[in-house]
């Protein structure tokens, strides 16, 4: 049985609210199995821990949670300049030479495609049940920000995008229940893939996740294509558990020179390329 590390920042109202719902749902009691944590609880197949640091700086997770934890799910807020109401999942890393929001430059964390796909599906179902599917966008986000130096697969699940949404107890309930439903039935089958192209909310890739059962690891948005290289593509593939054998490219907005890099890479690597 896999043990999941459910982690959050105690300073984040979204993550804190989700964690409080999980604690009350299970009637959890405090534990001392975590190191340097503000809060720590143990469930049947998970450890729930809150830390004082912001989530983008959670590179320390391997040293603070028990060794038996095999994957991480980070409960978090999501900020958007356009103030889009959203429930999102994504993986972490920096494609370019700078890392202004945590992690290291040109480094990706290990993606968690099966877990994030099931969470995405759960979010969609719950948003429908709670009557928020028209108001809130349920979507993948492209890979961005830290942490990057965690040695186990990790993904974020987030509430966006302003303090009003972060503090909304209904949002806490919806996103916490998406995690709870996963924990209670983590078995899931889907087709692991890597994504290239699209916006920060890659709607075509999200559509493929629902329609073709593709579970995405890293997604490189159109705005990051200036950093595309065979080395970055290899990082996107190998930094995923399980490792995908298919790259999905949103053709519109992906320039010819970028498509050539991808086409040569898949030819050398022997994996499938699909344009959408």
Swiss-Prot record:
<dbReference type="GO" id="GO:0008270">
    <property type="term" value="F:zinc ion binding"/>
</dbReference>
<dbReference type="InterPro" id="IPR018033">
    <property type="entry name" value="Deacylase_DtdA_archaea"/>
</dbReference>
<dbReference type="GO" id="GO:0019478">
    <property type="term" value="P:D-amino acid catabolic process"/>
</dbReference>
<dbReference type="Pfam" id="PF04414">
    <property type="entry name" value="tRNA_deacylase"/>
</dbReference>
<comment type="subunit">
    <text>Monomer.</text>
</comment>
<dbReference type="GO" id="GO:0051499">
    <property type="term" value="F:D-aminoacyl-tRNA deacylase activity"/>
</dbReference>
<protein>
    <recommendedName>
        <fullName>D-aminoacyl-tRNA deacylase</fullName>
        <ecNumber>3.1.1.96</ecNumber>
    </recommendedName>
</protein>
<comment type="function">
    <text>D-aminoacyl-tRNA deacylase with broad substrate specificity. By recycling D-aminoacyl-tRNA to D-amino acids and free tRNA molecules, this enzyme counteracts the toxicity associated with the formation of D-aminoacyl-tRNA entities in vivo.</text>
</comment>
<dbReference type="InterPro" id="IPR007508">
    <property type="entry name" value="DtdA"/>
</dbReference>
<keyword id="KW-0378">Hydrolase</keyword>
<comment type="similarity">
    <text>Belongs to the DtdA deacylase family.</text>
</comment>
<keyword id="KW-0862">Zinc</keyword>
<keyword id="KW-0479">Metal-binding</keyword>
């Amino acid at each position: 049985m896999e043990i999941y590390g459910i982690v959050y920042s105690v300073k984040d109202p979204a993550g804190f609210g989700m964690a409080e719902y999980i604690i009350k749902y299970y009637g959890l009691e405090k534990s001392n199995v975590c190191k340097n944590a503000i809060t720590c609880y143990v469930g049947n197949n998970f450890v729930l821990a809150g830390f004082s640091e912001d989530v983008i700086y959670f590179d320390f997770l391997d040293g603070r949670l028990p060794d038996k934890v095999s994957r991480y799910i980070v409960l978090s807020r999501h900020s958007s300049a356009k103030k889009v109401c959203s429930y999102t999942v994504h993986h972490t890393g920096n494609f370019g030479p700078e890392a202004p929001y945590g992690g290291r430059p040109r480094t990706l964390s290990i993606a968690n495609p099966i877990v994030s796909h099931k969470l995405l599906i759960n979010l969609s179902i719950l948003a429908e049940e709670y009557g928020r599917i028209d108001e809130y966008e349920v979507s993948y986000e492209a890979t961005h920000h830290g942490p990057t130096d965690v040695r186990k697969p990790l993904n974020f699940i987030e509430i966006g995008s302003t303090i009003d949404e972060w503090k909304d107890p209904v949002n806490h309930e919806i996103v916490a229940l998406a995690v709870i439903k996963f924990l209670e039935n983590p078995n899931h089958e889907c087709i692991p893939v890597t994504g290239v192209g699209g916006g920060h909310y890659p709607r075509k890739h999200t559509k493929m996740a629902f329609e073709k059962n593709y579970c995405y690891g890293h997604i490189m948005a159109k705005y990051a294509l200036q950093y595309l290289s065979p080395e970055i593509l290899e990082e996107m593939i190998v930094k995923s558990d399980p490792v995908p054998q298919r790259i999905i490219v949103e053709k519109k907005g992906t320039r010819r020179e970028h498509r050539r890099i991808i086409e040569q890479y898949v030819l050398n690597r022997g994996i499938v390329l699909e344009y959408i």
